[in-house]
Amino acid sequence: MFKGILLCVLFAVLSANPLSQPEGFADEEERDVRGLASLLGKALKAALKIGANALGGSPQQREANDERRFADGQQDYTGWMDFGRRDDEDDVNERDVRGFGSFLGKALKAGLKIGTHFLGGAPQQREANDERRFADGQQDYTGWMDFGRRDGQQDYTGWMDFGRRDDEDDVHERDVRGFGSFLGKALKAALKIGANALGGSPQQREANDERRFADGQQDYTGWMDFGRRNGEDD
């Protein structure tokens, strides 16, 4: 467009050359050329203004346009940055969700495995566990029965031994008492015979008899105590 305008201006200048025309006619032609040149200048100025506006206008306009474009560029850059950041955050969130889902899957699998072991495992495993528990229960029952039987036998034997020892102690005590009574009676008779053999006055014999009887009672009591202690020691 600018080349066309310049060619038109050049053609108008060449056409307005006064060398080939008379002087009066040249003046008139000069005015026409000036008018045409003024028109062309205005047209050129308008064209230049239009071109300047198309290219960015005046320096102030271009500066304002540059600032606006810079702001738009910043906005676009910020938008792309935000978009990239959101995209990265979406990727991170997706990875987090996947990781959390994997963790939940593993935890659920472990929980099911633990629950299966706690409940007894598979049907075959539960059947084997039931058989093993039944065998253990039988073993425990047999052990408790044996323990109770042995305990009962031991208690019965202990009570039998205690009763037998108690009966033996009673027999020994009766034997000791009988032997002490027999010795007391024999001693009393011997003392009486001896007193009669030795004679003495009746009062003396009576006093001697009383003393001997007291001594015999004391000896009898001593023998009884000795026999009882001996029986207790046995």
Swiss-Prot record:
GO CC, alphabetical: axon; extracellular space
Tissue: Expressed by the skin glands.
Chain positions with Phenylalanine amide modification: 83, 147, 162, 226
Keywords for the protein's UniProt record, in alphabetical order: Amidation, Amphibian defense peptide, Cleavage on pair of basic residues, Repeat, Secreted, Signal, Sulfation
Signal peptide: 1-26
Location within or outside the cell: Secreted
Family to which the UniProt record says this protein belongs: Belongs to the gastrin/cholecystokinin family.
Protein name: Preprocaerulein type-4
Organism for this UniProt entry: Xenopus borealis
